[in-house]
Swiss-Prot record:
GO terms for molecular function: RNA binding; zinc ion binding. Keywords: Cytoplasm, Metal-binding, mRNA processing, mRNA splicing, Nucleus, Repeat, RNA-binding, Zinc, Zinc-finger. It comes from Takifugu rubripes (Japanese pufferfish). Pfam families: zf-CCCH (PF00642), zf-CCCH_10 (PF22628). This is Muscleblind-like protein 2a. GO terms for cellular component: cytoplasm; nucleoplasm. InterPro entries: Znf-CCCH_Muscleblind-like, Znf_CCCH.
């Protein structure tokens, strides 16, 4: 089914409002100055609006008395902007409609999508698999032979936990913008670069050096030009190192703002999920739709009531197995014997 919305000409973006003062003959502005249209007598005006000539915008109108408005330069620019916005809206609407029609119209074509693993140490059995094809049929849960079912309870795993402790130490190290590394060559006394040229710190006093990581703490008051201490215990860096500290602070601030925005978005997502009316039932419905559980068929009445009605019915077993698996709280029970060897209950009435 081919749908081409872009081929339909939409004249709304070509519509301009006519100047009311011009209609009364009292407009003091010219056609090039007034923000409303001044159409000639040959143009058709309906409800105080006039349609601009599309060919005139392209510079190819050859009509002598065109019934559409040939707008001036400033109105032509406005119409071009309206046309671009209208084209974007048409493309967006066409894409959304095509996506909706893909799911509404059944077809035999199966589109292959990227597969994803579902065996996180739990569902490694061959009986639990997911097809990588999208079909018009809804997903459902089916019963499989008991010999290929896993012995452990089957649960639906959620999102794997994400560990953030690995990069915590490195992030803390990067967030310390008030420290500079001390030049090791300067400590040995053979640094050929001067204090204003070396990219590492050249502290005058050794007590201010932190021996654990060979760094020195920068005086932030000196960076802001307001340190009034006579003997400051913090390092007063030169101009090029001050610029380095300020750049590191700016980057740290941007990182903090981005992290705060991400945390706010995550909190809003969690609050939206908690505000759902039926979060648990919706999850169960998505995992196991109602199409997988067929209604329990009515058992035909028996002529004899000599205890034969208490025999086992295979259809009841299948329904109970599906219900037990849908609860996801306890392992499903499967009998060891085969249900095919049992005599159907309907054949007992003829004996």
């Amino acid at each position: 089914m081919a749908l081409n919305i872009a081929s339909i000409r939409d004249t709304k973006w070509l519509t301009l409002e006519v100047c009311r003062q011009f209609q009364r003959g009292t407009c003091s502005r010219s056609d090039e100055e007034c923000k409303f249209a001044h159409p000639p007598k040959s143009c058709q005006v309906e409800n105080g609006r006039v349609i601009a000539c599309f060919d005139s915008l392209k510079g190819r109108c050859t009509r002598e008395n065109c019934k559409y408005l040939h707008p001036p330069a400033h109105l032509k620019t406005q119409l071009e902007i309206n046309g671009r916005n209208n084209l974007i809206q048409q493309k967006t609407a066409a894409a959304m409609l095509a996506q909706q029609m893909q799911f509404m119209i059944p077809s035999t074509t199966m589109q292959h999508v990227q597969t994803f693993p579902v065996n996180q140490g739990l569902g490694s059995s061959a009986g639990l698999s997911y097809t990588p094809y999208l079909t018009p049929m809804s997903h459902s849960m089916g019963l499989v032979p008991t010999d290929i079912l896993p012995s452990t309870p089957v649960i639906v795993p959620g999102s794997p936990p994400v560990s953030v402790t690995a990069g915590s130490s490195s992030n803390q190290k990067l967030l310390r913008t008030d420290k500079l590394e001390v030049c090791r060559e300067f400590q040995r006394g053979n640094c050929a670069r001067g204090e204003t040229d070396c990219r590492f710190a050249h502290p005058s006093d050794s007590p201010m050096i932190d021996t654990s990581d060979n760094t020195v703490t920068v005086c932030m008051d000196y960076i802001k030009s307001r340190c009034s201490r006579e003997k400051c215990k913090y390092f007063h860096p030169p101009a090029h190192l001050q610029a380095k500290v300020k750049a590191a602070q700016h980057q740290a601030n941007q990182t903090a703002v981005a992290a705060q925005a991400a945390a706010t978005a995550a909190a809003m997502t969690q609050s939206t999920a908690k505000a759902m009316k039926r979060p648990l039932e919706a999850t169960v419905d998505l995992a196991f739709p109602h199409s997988g559980l067929q209604p329990l068929p009515k058992r035909p009445a028996l002529e004899k009531s000599n205890g034969s009605s208490s025999l086992f019915n295979p259809s009841v077993l299948h329904y109970q197995q599906a219900l037990a698996n849908a609860q996801l709280q306890q392992p499903a029970f499967f009998p060891t014997g085969s249900v095919l060897c049992m005599t159907p209950a309907s054949s007992l009435g003829r004996s």
